[in-house]
Amino acid sequence: MLSLQTLAKKVVACNYLSSDYDYMLQRFGLWWDLGPIHLCNNCKQIFSYKHLQCFSEDDLCLEAALVKAVKSDNLELIRLFVDWGANPEYGLIRVPAVHLKRLCTELGGLTPVSEPRLLEILKEVAKLKSCAGVLLGYDMFCHNPLLETVTRTTLDTVTYTCSNIPLTGDTAHHLLTKFWFALALRHNFTKAIHYFYKRHKNHLYWRVACSLYFNNIFDIHELCREKEICISPNLMMKFACLRKKNYAAIYYCYRLGASLDYGMNLSIYNNNTLNMFFCIDLGATDFDRAQRIAHKTYMYNLSNIFLVKQLFSRDVTLALDVTEPQEIYDMLKSYTSKNLKRAEEYLTAHPEIIVID
């Protein structure tokens, strides 16, 4: 149950006040980082008065605010954020100083933090899907001695489950850096992307691979504009074709000079017919090679379809000269493959060519 003072602070923080009240807010303990604290009563995000809407890239969930307060040794705000609902266990993850550890324990945090609970918190932070959450996860778990007892197999499993992308790294820190970087790229959290890239310039290849894998062409466009990419378009196409329905990434790679035939054949190898038909819709034509690859990979119905070469043609409704990311996304928003529809109609009309496994 909240004390009267804590409840009063919460009520004040949930309302906007003019700058005339700044001195009072400072004395009231609702001041942080040169500005007043505001708490959104709906989403429980903490943000400053300069942001009039929630979910900006500077918003902090209560747990992220707690960790920041622990790092800055702000005992008053630690108590306040826990009273407002922050989990005190988050304050224990970074192995704080003794007096901070004691305070978080007094406020309800369990110590020592068990390995299952540590990994559960990692997954909780990954699910926040916010810029602040990604940066919080990086701050809490990279170079964290509590992870030294966690086996690499366990850590690999947890990070893959949360990101759906295979990760590699010589150390737990290296692995987790790539993990949080991948989540930032997946959701296009530009502030977090720039934060990671500024500190890890050697991860350019990883940045490009993740952006293409997650269909984030905004980030690829930025790298191209800054002339940072020194990777061949066909190699970029390889990353784009790894995931289903990565139409925008495939289109952007094609605009950079990647071969549509290469993209079509890669998609067959990856057993991804939706990406394959998208490449055909854009103008891929090397059906002889595609037929051989389909047969080699035991996709016999697809192999038989490619024998009917006159069945396929470029979809003229897809413009081939769009370069701006948002325009590409808009163009493909309602995209459906005309060549896929033709193939399905042909198989329905010619059931004799269907191979049943």
Swiss-Prot record:
Superkingdom classification of source: Viruses
Entry-linked Pfam families: ASFV_360
Protein location: Host cytoplasm
GO biological process: symbiont-mediated suppression of host cytoplasmic pattern recognition receptor signaling pathway via inhibition of IRF3 activity; taxis
InterPro entries xref list: ASFV_MGF360
Cellular component terms (Gene Ontology): host cell cytoplasm
Keywords of the record: Host cytoplasm, Host-virus interaction, Inhibition of host innate immune response by virus, Inhibition of host IRF3 by virus, Inhibition of host RLR pathway by virus, Viral immunoevasion
Tagged with keyword Ubl conjugation: no
Protein task: Plays a role in virus cell tropism, and may be required for efficient virus replication in macrophages. Also inhibits the host cGAS/STING-mediated type I interferon production by inducing host IRF3 degradation through the proteasome pathway.
Name the record gives this protein: Protein MGF 360-14L
Organism: African swine fever virus (isolate Warthog/Namibia/Wart80/1980)
